[in-house]
């Protein structure tokens, strides 16, 4: 969401929604690799602000037939309509993915969207805090009890016949 245009995302994923008869979700991430941002004229230090602003626009593009919008990170829109429109007027379900950012958990809760905690290398307690924040804010924003909050979890594993082989093969990376 940080290095892509929300208008392009709105139109591309509404089209995909039509092609697959609504059987899709969209998972958005902020990105955590600094060198990628300049390829798109962005600065990783603006990552949170870009994620918040770009998603606010994407959310509006899918819900308003005509959008007048101005922000800090893209050109303004005046009387703009994203096409195609979401299938049956229902935008795709969105997951906000995060490795470490409480702001993204807050954003997911605010909109009533899913929160995907992608555990790459942080301790479990870190993700417990992120998910706890999301659940608390989910309730705060009136979406229901904390246990009804929509949480997804991810992780990585590198497996070999024995742990030493796995360590030796993966260590260079």
Describe the function of each predicted region.
Residues 1-173:
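N-terminal glycine-rich cofactor-binding segment that shapes the pocket for flavin-like pterin cofactors
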